[in-house]
């Protein structure tokens, strides 16, 4: 019995040492992967990397990791010099083939997602305007609502509005719905669905020039191509998927 107890103690001790060594190796590898991704993808912030699966060391010996989860902070988007915060930037990578130094990594499958709140999205809109949820029916068509005092919106975008025109416009508000799409995996495009009819010739075209614009997403790994956008009650949610996604090297 004493020998059995000693054997059990040794099993527990060595098992604990193995787990500790395995977790230590994971921690080191996560740092290596984060550094490789940051440098190869040109990111401005340090990604948070979580390598899934146990034991890790046997995965390394097989040169294949079950799953790597990546999250990013400090990601922004820009439009005409206006910066917009992008949150909840995440990527989930499956069946990742690696080499011994982690200098190359390729995921058989990958999914990515990101979020922009309406409050943040409004920072890219013409000054004086707001962007909000357009309601369930229009949201289902990928639309958002843009509104604001017409004269303020035009002037906020740098359009010269003469005093006689201001007097004619009075307190008139502009309220329209823009369709949101995503192009090339990193460009958010807003295009007005319809424009109000105004009593001043040429003003409608000027409004379109103001409210139609592109928002470039910066800091998202170039290998993750977002191709879906959904308008929800709390903002825009983006998603994308890919195969044979290269992460480093």
Question: Where are each of the predicted segments found?
Answer:
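Short, exposed beta-strand/loop patches in secreted or surface proteins that constitute
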Residues: 129-137, 179-181, 227-229
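One face of beta-strands
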Residues: 29, 33, 45-47, 66-68, ...
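N-terminal beta-strand/beta-hairpin edge segment
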Residues: 44-122, 126-155, 159-163
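Solvent-exposed coil/turn segments that connect beta secondary-structure elements
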Residues: 54, 73-75, 94-96, 149, ...
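Short, solvent-exposed secondary-structure boundary motifs
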Residues: 119-127, 162-173, 212-222
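Extracytoplasmic/luminal low-complexity segments enriched in Pro/Gly and acidic/polar residues
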Residues: 191-249
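Short helix-loop boundary/capping segments
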Residues: 148-203
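Hydrophobic membrane-targeting and insertion signals
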Residues: 1-61, 77-80, 247-249
């Amino acid at each position: 019995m004493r020998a059995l107890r000693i054997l059990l103690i040794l099993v527990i001790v060595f098992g604990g040492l193995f787990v500790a060594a395995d977790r230590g190796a994971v921690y080191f590898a996560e740092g290596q992967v984060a550094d490789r991704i940051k440098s190869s993808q040109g990111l401005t912030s340090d990604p948070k990397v979580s390598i899934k699966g146990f034991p890790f060391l046997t995965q390394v010996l097989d040169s294949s990791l079950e799953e790597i989860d990546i999250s990013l902070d400090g990601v922004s988007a820009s439009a005409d010099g206006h910066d917009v915060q992008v949150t909840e930037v995440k990527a989930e990578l499956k069946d990742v083939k690696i080499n011994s130094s982690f200098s190359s990594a390729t995921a058989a499958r990958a999914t990515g997602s990101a979020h922009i709140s309406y409050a943040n999205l409004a920072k890219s809109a013409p000054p004086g305007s707001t962007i909000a949820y357009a309601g369930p029916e229009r949201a289902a068509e990928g639309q958002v609502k843009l509104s604001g005092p017409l004269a303020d919106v035009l002037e906020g975008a740098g359009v010269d509005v003469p005093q006689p025109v201001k007097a004619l416009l009075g307190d008139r508000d502009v309220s329209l719905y823009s369709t949101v799409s995503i192009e090339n995996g990193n460009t958010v495009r807003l295009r007005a669905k319809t424009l109000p009819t105004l009593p001043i010739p040429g003003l409608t075209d000027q409004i379109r020039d103001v409210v139609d614009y592109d928002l470039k997403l910066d800091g998202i790994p170039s290998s993750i191509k977002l191709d879906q956008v959904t308008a929800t009650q709390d903002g825009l949610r983006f998603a994308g998927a890919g195969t044979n996604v290269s992460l480093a090297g």
